[in-house]
Amino acid sequence: MALKITQVKGTIGTKPKHRDNLRSLGLKRIRHSVVRPDTPEVRGMVQAVRHLIVVEEVAGE
């Protein structure tokens, strides 16, 4: 199982830690999507920035 993560809000006015989490996930701009494996580390980063992203579960790695 994998997670498709899409950034839906910008980073202006957000905390530096949230910007770092988005960058670590590979997100750079609004409506940019990445697919990441469903691991506890990725889930933790997703939880921290859940107000800036949309997450979908997809089949595959």
Curated annotation (Swiss-Prot):
GO terms for molecular function: structural constituent of ribosome. CDD domains: Ribosomal_L30. Gene3D superfamilies: Ribosomal protein L30, ferredoxin-like fold domain (3.30.1390.20). It comes from the Bacteria. Pfam families: Ribosomal_L30. This is Large ribosomal subunit protein uL30. InterPro entries: Ribo_uL30_ferredoxin-like_sf, Ribosomal_uL30_bac-type, Ribosomal_uL30_ferredoxin-like. Keywords: Ribonucleoprotein, Ribosomal protein. PANTHER family: LARGE RIBOSOMAL SUBUNIT PROTEIN UL30M, MITOCHONDRIAL RIBOSOMAL PROTEIN L30. GO terms for cellular component: cytosolic large ribosomal subunit. One of its GO terms (biological process) is translation. Part of the 50S ribosomal subunit. Belongs to the universal ribosomal protein uL30 family.
